């Protein structure tokens, strides 16, 4: 860490030095998105002292998004150079003598079908520009002891421009001299227009604050969503972070309105190697950020699990009472209520924070028989997930996986996973790969945030990295999440229903099952089966899906409200959640098939209903020309299930006629 700080100080001195230099040459390249809305300009300035610096700008529909910002990787390789008998690099900053040798442009336009997702078909359409640089020049006659003793490096800067956003990264081709790379940071900057406001979040399970780009107490999590003074909305994210160090954003100490890519730790790599993607999404309307989140998956390699038939998303209830009889009641409840899994959480094999706890067997003080539970559950079509803390996973993973497969366990929830540095990032993704070998699905809890790895290893169904119902946030927080955290992938919010600590209405909780995407969706997080007293609206949880054929964002304003509609087969599900203010909201149903009538089962808050949950169930006939007029309570919401209406249903139920709901 001290080495990283010293390099940051050195970089600040270097920047101040080049600012006092005269530019003698500028080399420009540019790349546009297929629809022409994004324009990415990248250029290298050469100064009078011989140093060079790479910069970029980004505009969207002619409006400035990223003003002149530095690019580059900070590498400290003198130790490796000395060990191989290669002369040390004398540059104060590693990229100061990079020379552009050529470029290559490419266009890709295809689609792919995910195993599961928010859409059954994903468009992958982008323009690509690759700039190839060299550092130093090859000299003849230095091929000694089987390797090249030149101080010679190659680096490519790769840019992709999609209609959905722009991404870039640094690629290092295979070295000819055997050198490793010791990366201590990045020069990567994001200079935003003056007046930008950011949804600052200090840690992955933290609250949000809307703040200017100044006086931050610490770094900020990604994705980072911002409002620009020119009316645009921007989100900065990371993709394909597998064996690198996690990036966050910190304020640049010497340049106003500038965010610096900040790595958790240094990184040691062997070439060829590509850093993670730095991703920029831009939209005129904040709801379009949500609709463009496929870019994160597109920036990751395709599915590497050849036989994926065992990977089955679904809904799950946690057994809060870890006694055999109570767990079996959860199995019965899951089977009756259309769930697919039950989950046994922390403590089943002993104190989770003790290295001595053995996850190959049930703790002596627990009345649990795991094989018997699995046998009982399988007869009812229910699978079992179990929690295992990282302390046990680190010691026992290779022993646990064949045992759990033998028992019939379907998935593991990884608990309290250390993340951030290169070591633990690599360990975690390797652990997911190992789970795939034994046909075991994964849910990662606590601070991990996705960067698209579920495309490559879809047994990673979901992850926490979210302030959800374990912390019981308020409704305003909930209306920020779709525009921030959920841009990077599925989130395990752990939805509750009956628990009296929730700070929203019950219809709000119902709607979150649609608004929040999670292929493994926890419902009833703090609840027990006995809490259910026949409330009719629970049928919505029974029927709602966790993966989708289509997703459409109908309306929304960050921190105020959001409405999302999702389709599974012929059925549509709609969820609306509002913040702590009451409001009226018009919701057009134009996403429904034209020339088709639907039976809408509508779930809204109503204090007149004589149940503990106060949710009204209304059934009406609608079509694509209908517009619902919702009256949301403070911290409220509504949920709707649309099914194609039969002739009998059209006769039985009245048509919606614009009445308030």
Which residues does each PLM region occupy?
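N-terminal accessory beta-strand-rich subdomains and adjacent acidic, glycine-rich linkers
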Residues: 23-299
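Solvent-exposed beta-strand/loop surfaces of large extracellular or lumenal domains
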Residues: 120, 141-145, 200-208, 602-625
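C-terminal beta-strand-rich structural cap/linker in extracellular carbohydrate-active enzymes
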Residues: 620-657
């Amino acid at each position: 860490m001290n080495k990283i700080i010293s390099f940051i100080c050195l970089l600040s001195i270097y920047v101040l030095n080049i600012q006092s230099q005269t530019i003698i040459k500028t080399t420009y390249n540019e790349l546009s998105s297929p629809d022409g809305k994004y324009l990415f300009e990248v250029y290298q300035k050469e100064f009078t002292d011989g140093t060079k610096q790479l910069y970029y700008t980004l505009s969207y529909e002619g409006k400035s998004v990223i003003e002149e910002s530095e690019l580059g990787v900070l590498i400290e390789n003198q130790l490796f150079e000395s060990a191989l008998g290669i002369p040390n690099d004398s540059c104060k900053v590693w990229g100061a003598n990079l020379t552009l040798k050529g470029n290559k442009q490419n266009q890709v336009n295809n689609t792919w079908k995910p195993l599961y997702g928010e859409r059954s078909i994903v468009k992958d359409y982008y323009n690509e520009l690759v700039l190839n640089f060299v550092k130093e020049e090859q000299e003849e006659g230095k091929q000694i002891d089987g390797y090249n003793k030149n101080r010679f490096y190659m680096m490519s800067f790769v840019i992709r421009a999609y209609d959905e956003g722009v991404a870039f990264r640094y690629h290092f081709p295979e070295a000819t001299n055997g050198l490793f790379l010791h990366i201590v940071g990045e020069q990567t900057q994001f200079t935003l227009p003056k007046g930008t406001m950011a949804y600052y979040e200090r840690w992955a399970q933290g609250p949000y604050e809307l703040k200017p780009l100044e006086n931050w107490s610490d770094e900020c999590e990604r994705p980072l969503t911002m409002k620009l003074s020119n009316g645009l909305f921007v989100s900065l994210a990371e993709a394909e972070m597998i064996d690198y160090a996690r990036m966050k954003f910190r304020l640049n100490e010497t340049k106003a309105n500038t965010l610096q890519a900040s790595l958790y730790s240094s990184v040691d790599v062997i070439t060829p190697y590509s850093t993670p993607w730095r991703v920029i999404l831009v939209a005129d309307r904040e709801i379009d950020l949500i609709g463009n989140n496929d870019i994160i998956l597109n920036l990751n390699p395709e599915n590497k699990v050849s036989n994926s038939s065992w990977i089955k998303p679904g809904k799950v209830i946690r057994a809060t009472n870890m006694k055999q009889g109570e767990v079996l009641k959860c199995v019965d409840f899951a089977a009756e209520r259309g769930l697919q899994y039950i989950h046994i959480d922390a403590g089943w094999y002993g104190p989770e924070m003790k290295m001595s706890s053995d996850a190959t067997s049930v703790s002596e003080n627990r009345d649990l028989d795991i094989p018997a539970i699995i046998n009982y559950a399988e007869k009812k079509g229910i699978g079992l997930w179990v929690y295992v803390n990282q302390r046990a996973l680190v010691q026992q993973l290779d022993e646990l996986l064949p045992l759990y497969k033998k028992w019939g366990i379907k998935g593991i929830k990884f608990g309290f996973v250390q993340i951030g540095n290169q070591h633990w990032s690599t360990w975690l993704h390797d652990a997911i790969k190992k789970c795939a070998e034994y046909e075991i699905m994964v849910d990662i809890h606590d601070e991990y945030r996705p960067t698209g790895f579920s495309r490559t290893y879809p047994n990673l169904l979901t992850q926490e990295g979210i302030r959800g119902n374990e912390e019981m946030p308020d409704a305003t927080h909930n209306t920020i999440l779709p525009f921030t955290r959920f841009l990077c992938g599925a989130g395990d919010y752990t939805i509750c229903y009956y628990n009296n600590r929730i700070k929203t209405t019950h219809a709000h909780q119902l709607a979150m099952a649609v608004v929040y995407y999670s292929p493994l969706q926890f419902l009833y997080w703090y609840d027990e089966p006995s809490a259910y007293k026949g409330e009719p609206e629970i049928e919505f949880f029974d029927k709602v899906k966790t993966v989708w054929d289509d997703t459409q964002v109908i309306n929304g304003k960050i921190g105020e409200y959001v409405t999302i509609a999702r389709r599974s087969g012929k059925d549509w599900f709609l969820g609306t959640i509002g913040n702590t203010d009451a409001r009226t909201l018009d919701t057009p149903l134009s996403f429904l098939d034209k020339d088709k009538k639907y039976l809408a089962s509508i779930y809204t808050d109503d204090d007149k209903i004589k149940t503990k949950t106060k949710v009204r169930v209304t059934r009406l006939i609608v079509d694509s020309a209908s517009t619902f007029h919702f009256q949301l309570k403070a911290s409220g919401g509504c949920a709707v299930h649309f099914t194609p209406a039969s002739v009998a249903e059209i006769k039985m139920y009245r048509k919606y006629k614009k009445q308030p709901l």
